[in-house]
Amino acid sequence: MSNITIYDVAREANVSMATVSRVVNGNPNVKPTTRKKVLEAIERLGYRPNAVARGLASKKTTTVGVIIPDISSIFYSELARGIEDIATMYKYNIILSNSDQNMEKELHLLNTMLGKQVDGIVFMGGNITDEHVAEFKRSPVPIVLAASVEEQEETPSVAIDYEQAIYDAVKLLVDKGHTDIAFVSGPMAEPINRSKKLQGYKRALEEANLPFNEQFVAEGDYTYDSGLEALQHLMSLDKKPTAILSATDEMALGIIHAAQDQGLSIPEDLDIIGFDNTRLSLMVRPQLSTVVQPTYDIGAVAMRLLTKLMNKEPVEEHIVELPHRIELRKSTKS
C-alpha cells in the first residue's frame, strides 16, 4: 500500500494523530497498551514516517550530513564507519556525499545538506579555506570537522596532533642515526601539510641540529603514483636520503615499490615510515612502519561530539586531539 499517512494509522489504531506522532517520535508520555496498538497499526499498514515532515513538527529530522573528500579512500571509509556506528547508536540516519576534494563542490554540498534540513554535519576536507569557515559560521546547525585542520580552530574538530606525530616519526629516524631524512608530503595548499606536518618535520631536524634541505621535501597528492614519482625525484639528487617519511601509507607503498624497482633493499638501503596505519601497511613487503592515526575513533568521537552539540549538551573541549603512536614493522631497521 502506498502513501499511507499518519491519519490512516490514527484511524486504524482508533487514536488521535497526536498520539501516533508521540509514538513515532519516541515520546514517553504514551500508555504501553496504546503504544503497542499504534505500533501494530504501523506494522500492518506499512507506514513509513517521513523524516522531513516529522522534522517540521519536532524541528529535528534525526538526519546527519557527512561530507567526505574521497569515498574510495581506505582512510576515509574507515572514518565514515566510526561516524556511522555512533550515528546508529544515537538513532541518526546519515546522508553521505563525496566532494572529490573540490572546494566548490564542498560548499555546494554543504548548502544542499542544509536544504535537506539535516540536524548537523560532519565535514572532512583537506583544504579548509576562509570561505569554508564563513559558511560553517553561517550554518544554522552544528558542524564538526573530522581528521581535518582549520588553522583558526574556530570550528569544533576531532583529529590527532599532526605536527607532533610527524615530529615523533622524524625524531625516531634521527635516533636511529639518520641525518638525511626526506619527507613526502601531501599538497602544501592544505593547512594539515603546510602548517602542521611540514612544521613537525622542520622542528625535529632543528632540534637535532640537522639542516633543512628543501630538496628533501617532495610534494605528493596522497596517491600511490605520487609516491613512485617522489622516490624517483629523491634518488635523482646528488645527495640521496637514507630515510623517507611519507604523509600517507598509500604514497609509502609507491615509494617502497619504486625503490625496489631501482634495486634498493628496504630497510637495508632506505628506512621508510608511512602515516595512517591503514590496512595497506600490512599488504606490502616489507610490512610498513607507520604513524597510527586512530581513524575509526576519530570518526566515532566526531559523531559523538556532534550529537552533544545538536542536543545542546555541555561540551568541555571543542578541539579534541586523540593520541597517536608509531607502529614499527619491517620497513625500518630494528
UniProtKB/Swiss-Prot annotation:
Gene that produces this protein: ccpA
Domain (HTH lacI-type) ranges: 1-58
Keyword list, A-Z: Activator, DNA-binding, Repressor, Transcription, Transcription regulation
Cellular-component GO terms for this entry: protein-DNA complex
Regions recorded as binding DNA: 6-25
SUPFAM superfamilies assigned to the protein according to its UniProt record, in alphabetical order: lambda repressor-like DNA-binding domains (SSF47413), Periplasmic binding protein-like I (SSF53822)
Listed CDD domains: HTH_LacI, PBP1_CcpA
Pfam families in the record: LacI, Peripla_BP_3
Protein's UniProt name: Catabolite control protein A
PANTHER family: ARABINOSE METABOLISM TRANSCRIPTIONAL REPRESSOR, LACI-RELATED TRANSCRIPTIONAL REPRESSOR
Annotated organism of origin: Bacillus subtilis (strain 168)
Single Gene Ontology BP annotation: negative regulation of DNA-templated transcription
Highest taxon listed in the record's lineage: Bacteria
Any one GO molecular-function label of the UniProt entry: DNA-binding transcription activator activity
Assembly behavior: Homodimer. Interacts with P-Ser-HPr and P-Ser-Crh.
Function: Global transcriptional regulator of carbon catabolite repression (CCR) and carbon catabolite activation (CCA), which ensures optimal energy usage under diverse conditions. Interacts with either P-Ser-HPr or P-Ser-Crh, leading to the formation of a complex that binds to DNA at the catabolite-response elements (cre). Binding to DNA allows activation or repression of many different genes and operons.
Record carries keyword Transcription regulation: yes
PROSITE patterns linked to this entry: HTH_LACI_1 (PS00356), HTH_LACI_2 (PS50932)
